[in-house]
């Protein structure tokens, strides 16, 4: 089995990991109730999507 020829330095390791970051979710305001919700998803507070009630509460 292959073994690394040299030890990976802290700098090289950290530079490689700069791209392994989490992205912020796209939060928007619900047009019917004003709660914060994820874009392109049903609002958890009022149950509407694209102006129509999808989930009755």
Swiss-Prot record:
| Coiled-coil residue spans | none
Q: Which UniProt keywords are listed? A: Ribonucleoprotein, Ribosomal protein
Concerning SUPFAM superfamilies, the annotation shows:
Zn-binding ribosomal proteins
Cellular component GO terms, alphabetically?
large ribosomal subunit
Origin superkingdom = Bacteria
Q: Which InterPro entries does this one have? A: Ribosomal_bL32, Ribosomal_bL32_bact, Ribosomal_zn-bd
Question: Which Pfam families does the record associate with it?
Answer: Ribosomal_L32p
An annotated GO BP: translation
MF terms (GO), sorted A to Z: structural constituent of ribosome
Signal peptide (UniProt feature, chain positions): none
Q: Which family does it belong to?
A: Belongs to the bacterial ribosomal protein bL32 family.
* Name the record gives this protein: Large ribosomal subunit protein bL32
Which species is this UniProt entry from?
A: Bacillus anthracis
This protein's gene is called: rpmF
